């Protein structure tokens, strides 16, 4: 994109207004949008609609990437790749129902139970990803990570950041529940910390 110094005055003013109004996509792609409007001979209302819709889509894209970044997902989380032949634990109909996320809207908790290697973490990660795509703030961590965070948040800045992220999450998936030996001193969690989610 051209620098402000080399732009015509009206483009410079539009770009500055877009930045001040926190419309980064419009500020960055103004030339492209103006050229398209001229090519298609858009009306004023069509041009305005184009600007706002593209800004909105870009905002949704950036919001999704931010939620995905902070979700704590492993490398593989695409439920389309789930191998239904390897386990009798869940069938395709049940998977489709889970992916509809009705259980989130109804604030149900899910408990995934099975032997090691049957895909519990993969399913939980995939459902977290489905929730992120649907606009939810979701987070995946192990039970050990959760309790370490709760125990050290007052003395550790990273732990406090994780704690704040957990408290803002609309869906929390807790992995490796049966692998972490609970100590009595760690079991007492304050009421605001109790979240709905998957375990």
Describe every region a protein language model picked out.
Residues 112:
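Hydrophobic anchor at the beta1->P-loop junction of P-loop NTPases
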Residues 158-186, 190:
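Conserved nucleotide-sensing/catalytic segment adjacent to the nucleotide-binding pocket
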Residues 187-199:
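Single conserved hydrophobic/aromatic residue that forms the stacking wall/gate
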Residues 100-107:
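Phosphate-binding P-loop
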Residues 24-73:
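Interdomain "pre-motor" coupling segment immediately N-terminal to P-loop NTPase/helicase cores
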Residues 79-98:
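N-terminal pre-Walker A segment at the start of P-loop NTPase domains
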Residues 91-93, 140-166:
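Short glycine-rich substrate-engagement loop in P-loop NTPases that contacts/grips substrate
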Residues 115-134:
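Walker A/P-loop
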């Amino acid at each position: 994109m051209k620098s402000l110094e080399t732009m015509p005055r009206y483009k410079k003013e539009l770009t500055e207004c877009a930045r001040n109004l926190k419309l980064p996509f419009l500020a960055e792609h103004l030339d492209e949008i103006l050229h398209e409007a001229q090519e298609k001979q858009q009306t004023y209302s069509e041009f305005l609609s184009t600007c706002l819709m593209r800004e909105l889509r870009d905002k949704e894209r950036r919001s999704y990437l931010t939620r995905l970044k902070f979700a704590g997902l492993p490398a593989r989380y695409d439920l389309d790749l789930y191998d239904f032949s390897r386990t009798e634990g869940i069938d395709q109909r049940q998977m489709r129902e889970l992916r509809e996320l009705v259980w989130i809207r109804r604030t149900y908790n899910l408990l995934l139970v099975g032997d090691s290697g049957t895909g519990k973490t993969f399913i939980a990660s995939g459902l977290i990803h489905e929730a992120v795509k649907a606009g939810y703030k979701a987070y995946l961590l192990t039970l050990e990570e959760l309790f370490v965070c709760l125990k050290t948040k007052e003395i550790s800045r990273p732990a406090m950041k994780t704690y704040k992220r957990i408290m803002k999450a609309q869906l929390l998936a807790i992995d490796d529940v049966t692998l972490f030996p609970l100590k009595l001193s760690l079991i007492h969690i304050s009421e605001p910390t109790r979240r709905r989610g998957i375990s």
